[in-house]
């Protein structure tokens, strides 16, 4: 049985294979794992085009195998960044591109959902590539905790159980 590769490029060595090179291959796998768990890289966007991020089976350096990807470059039209259909992971994405145009992050094919940095929106997003469908997988945005902290109109959708003192500075109606 020959070695196989995970969707993010880690080599799964077959029993008894790679005599004499096992240590080198294992070290490469550990470096790939390090990229996946916390690596940072930059990806220049193509002006109004598509950048296809690809896996490098058994090799380090694949942009899509890094945890954080920063998009750079000057764009004058919508730029799209794609990943292969079988990738299931989460990313920290940063849009540092110049130009007031959309940057779309999605799977390479299919009609699943994507995420978009709209026009002048720069900054960060946390996204989850679900690989939830063989032909139409979704990309989901995970909100930052700041969205909860900055909520000026919080609402409670159920009963509130207070185990201690309730402190307030307004009117309490029961």
Pin down the residues of each PLM region.
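Intrinsic low-complexity, repeat-rich intrinsically disordered segments enriched
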Residues: 41-52, 111-113, 145-174
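Short, surface-exposed terminal/edge motifs of secreted or surface/virion proteins that either
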Residues: 30-39, 99-108, 113-114, 126-144
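Tight coil/turn sites that cap or link beta-strands
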Residues: 86-88, 120-124
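Beta-strand repeat scaffolds of extracellular/surface proteins
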Residues: 31, 72-75, 86, 96-97, ...
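Short beta-strand segments within Ig-like beta-sandwich modules, predominantly Fibronectin type-III
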Residues: 116-118
């Amino acid at each position: 049985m020959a070695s196989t590769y995970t969707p993010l490029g880690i080599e799964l060595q077959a029993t008894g294979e790679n005599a004499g090179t096992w240590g080198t291959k294992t070290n490469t796998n550990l470096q790939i794992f390090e990229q996946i768990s916390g690596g940072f890289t930059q990806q220049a966007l193509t002006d109004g085009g598509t950048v296809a991020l690809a896996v490098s089976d058994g090799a380090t350096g694949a942009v899509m195998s890094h945890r954080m990807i920063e998009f750079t470059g000057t764009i004058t039209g919508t730029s799209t960044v794609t990943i292969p259909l079988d990738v299931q992971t989460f990313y920290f994405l940063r849009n540092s591109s110049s130009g007031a145009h959309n940057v779309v992050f999605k799977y390479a094919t299919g009609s699943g959902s994507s995420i978009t940095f709209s026009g002048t929106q720069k900054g960060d997003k946390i996204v989850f590539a679900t690989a939830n469908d063989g032909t139409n997988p979704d990309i989901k945005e995970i909100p930052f905790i700041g969205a909860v902290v900055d909520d000026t109109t919080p609402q409670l959708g159920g009963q509130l159980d207070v185990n201690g003192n309730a402190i307030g500075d307004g009117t309490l109606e029961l």
